[in-house]
Design a protein with these regions (language model features):
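Long, charged, low-complexity intrinsically disordered regions
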Residues: 1-6, 166-179
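Nucleotide-state-sensitive switch-loop elements of NTP-binding domains
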Residues: 2-10, 15-123
Length: 179
């Protein structure tokens, strides 16, 4: 059909994926009138309101089951909606291989992989689900730790990511909005 730029926003439940997508869509540099399809693989804490979607020429397609995400599904979305780009809000509990199999079989062209991490739970995830966490970091172009505070061990987190992906950019955002 046609090459379809895709931005993968990946992380565990309530790690800030929807918030990042909403903030990105509302930025002038990104909101240039292109039609954006948001594929969501979970229902999180933050919802996409109708006004924001209209303002940013965006729409949401919810995928209830991973089995529903197929090359036929993607091609059907292209035929029915004619999006200019796709933002994929992907749950960190799902296998990335399943997603990449479909990406490789379709016109989706992965432009950027962003991983969001709730810094207040990152230590727990690193201890209990290290392999899943590291899998996300391996593919990431950008890792954003949000909800940071004075006790966030930024150096340790940065080293963990750089050990598996030296090219990844790592950013930290404080919960209180301070620099």
């Amino acid at each position: 059909m046609y090459e379809l730029p895709a931005y993968l926003v990946w992380g565990f439940l309530e790690s800030g994926k929807s918030t990042l997508i909403k903030e990105t869509l509302n930025q002038d540099y990104f909101n240039d009138g292109e039609k954006t399809m948001i594929l969501t693989f979970e229902e999180g804490e933050v919802e996409y309101d109708k006004e924001m979607l209209e303002k940013t020429n965006s729409f949401v397609v919810n995928i209830e089951n991973m089995e529903d995400f197929t090359k036929e599904f993607v091609r059907g979305c292209q035929r029915n909606y004619y999006p200019d780009r796709v933002m994929i809000e992907y749950n960190g509990m799902y296998s990335i291989d399943d997603l990449m199999d479909v990406v490789d079989e379709t016109d989706l062209e992965l432009y950027q992989v962003i991983v969001t991490v709730d810094a207040s739970t990152a230590d727990l995830y690193l201890k209990n689900m290290k392999s899943m966490f590291m899998e996300m970091f391996k593919m990431a172009d950008l890792v954003i730790f949000n909800r940071c505070d004075d006790n966030t061990n930024m150096g340790s987190f940065r080293r963990s990511i750089k050990a598996v992906n030296p090219r990844a950019q790592v950013g930290f955002e404080r919960a209180d909005g301070k620099e």
